[in-house]
């Protein structure tokens, strides 16, 4: 992942539950980023503990596959959890038209085929999404967003 970060300070084995700011001290990105990582670690671990390695809500579970008469595969809308991390698909989408398309073509022909949901995080910069640039400050990029990508 790319970004201009001071340092990575999050270590799960320290068992910190938060980072507290002190008055009159310098505010640095490492403290903020560690708090974000602590919260994410707790959220993902809690979800994995309660849901299991993967799963979805009873109503609204996403990523179900349907095949039409012509053999076209559609990935269903909804939410699913992969290793405790939330993955969302806002609308039904053709297998071949996913936001992060697969490198190869889907299998063709009759028979059994294996499908699985793969998810990952990636940084999104102002180059990727100009709306995250801070125009009120003259246009610098003040942050990097983290996007959860997926592919079936």
Region locations from a protein language model:
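Beta-strand-rich solenoidal segments
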Residues: 2-21, 69-152
